[in-house]
Structure formats: C-alpha cells, structure tokens
Amino acid sequence: MSLNSASTREHPSEAWKSLAQYLPSRSTDLDYWWQRIGPSAALVLEKAGYSIKSQYDALLFLYHWVVPELGPSLLSTDHKWKSLLQGDGSAFELSWKWNTNDSPPEVRYVVEPINQFSGTLLDPLNSQPSMVFRHRLASILPNIDLTWCHHFAGSLFDHNKARLLREMMPEGHKMPAGYTVPSTLVALEFLQDGQVATKSYFIPRKHGQGVWLPIAQFEESIAELDPVNEARAAVVDFVSKDPESLTPIMLAVDDKDVSSARIKWYFATARTELSWAKEIMTLGGRITTKHLPHLEQQLDDLIELIKAVTGIASEYPQDVELPFAPRFDPSKGAGNFVPLPIPIAGYQVHFNIAPGSEVPGVKLYIPMRRYARDDASVAKGITSFMESRGRNTYIKEYTEMLAGLLPDGKELSSVHCLQTYVSCLFKKNGELEITTYLGMAPYGDNHKPMSI
C-alpha cells in the first residue's frame, strides 16, 4: 500500500467541501484555524467511518465551538502562548481510538483554550478560558456536571497570580524558552451514536511546589470529594514504593455526576523497559486474573504492540531500556520532537479510578518521539498488529488518513511524530483498547515542526 502524501486540501472529504463552500468567513484568526484544522478533522472523521450526519455534527461543532477557543493564529504577532499540545505551539489535538471486533473507531478532539490574556498577570496559567469554555458547553450538551471540575480548579491551584507568574517559567517546569506547561485542557469525544462526552484535565500549580505537585497533595484533593476508594489506595501504594520511577503530572475527570465520574490520574516516567510496562499494567502485581481473566495474554499482546510500533527485535531483552531511534540527536535539545524533560519522556500512564472500584483501569502511553524510526514504520507496525488480531476493517482507511494529513510533497517515511503516542488499555473481555494520538505538526529530519 502506498504511503505517499495525499494532501487533504487536494482530496477533501465531501463533508468538508460542502461546509467550506457555504460557511462564511469570520476573521483572520478564525479563518486561519478553520482552514488549518478543519480539513484534517474532516479526513479523520471520514476515514473512521462516521456517518455523513455525524461528520457534519463534529465539523460544525469544531467551527462554532472549538475554533474560537484557539486564540491568535500562529502567524500573528499576538500569538504569545505556545501550547505544549503540539510542537509548533498550536492548541489542538486529534486522536483515533481503534475499532474493536464489535465497534468502529472513535475520534476525539483535545483543546487548550487561549485568549488575549493567556500568560499575562491576569491569567498567568491560562486557566480562565478553559473554565469559560466548559460553561459554554454546558449550555448545549446535556448531562454535563462541573462539580469535580470546579473542585480541582480550586484545590490544585494557588491564586496569588503575581507569585505564580514569577515561579512558573522557564525554570519552574524546565521547559524550553517560549513553551508553557498548560494548566487545564478540555477533551471532546465524538461517539459514533452522535453523543459528545467531555473531560477536564488539570496540571496543578501551587506556590513553591517545585516542578510537579507531590503525590500526597494530589491524593488530598481527590479525597475531599471521594474519601474512601480502594482503587486509589492501590495506586498510591504502588507509586509510593518507588517514587523516583513515577512522577504524578495531571488529573482528568469526566464532566458528569460525582457518583459516576471516573478520575484519571496521570504519571510519567523516564523508564521504558518492557518489564516495566508489565509492572505498570499489573500495578506491581495488585491487578491479577481475578480482575482481568485474560491478563497473561494481554500482557503478551502489549509487549508485541510495543515491539511493533518501535521496531525493536522480537528477541529484545525485557529488562533493557528501549533504544533511541537512530534519528534521535541529544544535541538538538532535551525534548527532541515536542519538548519534554528527560525525567518524564518515557512511558506515560493513567490510572482510571472509578467510584467503588477495587483496582484501577490502567492505560499505558508509548511515546513515539524518541523510540520510533518514522511514521511509516509506526503505521506499518500498528496495522500489522491489528491485522494479526483480526481487527483489519479500518487498516486501509487509517493508512490513507495518515498520508492525507501530511504536508504537500511529504511521505510518512520522511516525517516523525505525526503519530505522537500509541496507548493501550486492557479490557475485561480480553481485548486491547488501542488509541493513536495525532500531531498537527510532524517533524522532519531537521527537527523542526511542520504545521499541517
């Protein structure tokens, strides 16, 4: 199958062509973002098998509700807040949750809302636009409940803005000049049945906390609304055994009633051994076949998935760190393809803590930025893995989608980080829930992002 570029602007989806013809121009910045991300979102939705009605719904949602939140265009002198969501500083991400044997793919948007006050003394952490955005969404989406959201916005942040501005950058989070760790993100999941589910993400910032908020302060915040939870206790016990290996970085929560909302507690690590991936997925042996009847096979499948997307040999030792891709060049900066400090540039993980659960669900994120050879290799690896498990219905569409996202004249073999992460969650029925996260600014061999 050809992996050559097929620009979305040369071959747009039918839904995009129709909307582009009839939706009016609004302003320089709004038109910039709509023309920048609209064709890409349209292509991903089309290739994921969404009905034409669902494509229109998701694209009109993008046009009316998301695009106005993205701030000044990247070309504007007013563009001062560089989001870490993308290497070029844009604040929008797409992801593709792979089909299972009985369900089609699902597409998700993630956005970091930005306005003219982002990063100023009025809003040094850029937290206000996201909260306003959530309340606007609550006016059109049924069943949104922001109780958890307001709780975390109050308990995970201090509010002396002048002090926060002094402490936050660049030393505070050790990020390259110009990039800022976001404080809050909003995820929008477009289900194939037409529903839209939202999640809120929080990266805490308290006075004098150092680089990241300690585990105990995360735990204290969660316990205020959910005092007793076995799954959370299991997570704290696991991560406390080796606090140097897992760094708590973020919380996310479903925007729904506290009694049913799940909390996702995110950690990052510098480690990448295959054995470490298995240790994380079993919570150090706390998750067993009692909780996941197909656990042993799922662990084997996870190792095969990691090998497939990174290109390491089938006999690669389980207790050795993954090798850097040949293109990785430390002289280009600590982050190399979307800047991240070394201590959190290995696996990432979230523990999905549901009310009343005994153990959490665990999702592992495999980073492509350091360990994958190029996007063609990642695409070949993940599609081969899916085909070997009988999940080949959307392989052709996935590959076409990737090629269509590329800048004109580019091929998947010459770019990196179009696929930024591949994640894996074990389902109770034995399946692996696998998601690909898509970069809107893949990198060439010059280590510079290319806006698409």
Swiss-Prot record:
CDD domains reported in the protein's UniProt record: PT-DMATS_CymD
Residue ranges crossing the lipid bilayer per the database entry: none
Origin superkingdom: Eukaryota
Keywords noted in UniProt: Transferase
Biological process (GO), any one: alkaloid metabolic process
Listed pathway(s): Mycotoxin biosynthesis
EC number: 2.5.1.-
Uppermost EC category: transferase
UniProt xrefs under Pfam families: Trp_DMAT (PF11991)
GO molecular function: prenyltransferase activity
Job of this protein: Prenyltransferase; part of the gene cluster that mediates the biosynthesis of fusaridione A, a bright yellow trans-fused decalin-containing tetramic acid with antimicrobial activity. The PKS module of fsdS catalyzes the formation of the polyketide unit which is then conjugated to L-tyrosine by the condensation domain of the fsdS NRPS module. Activity of the Dieckmann cyclase domain (RED) results in release of the intermediate fusaridione A. The unstable pyrrolidinedione ring of fusaridione A is opened through a reverse-Dieckmann reaction to afford its ring-opened form.
UniProt similarity note: Belongs to the tryptophan dimethylallyltransferase family.
Stated name of the protein: Prenyltransferase fsdK
Species: Fusarium heterosporum
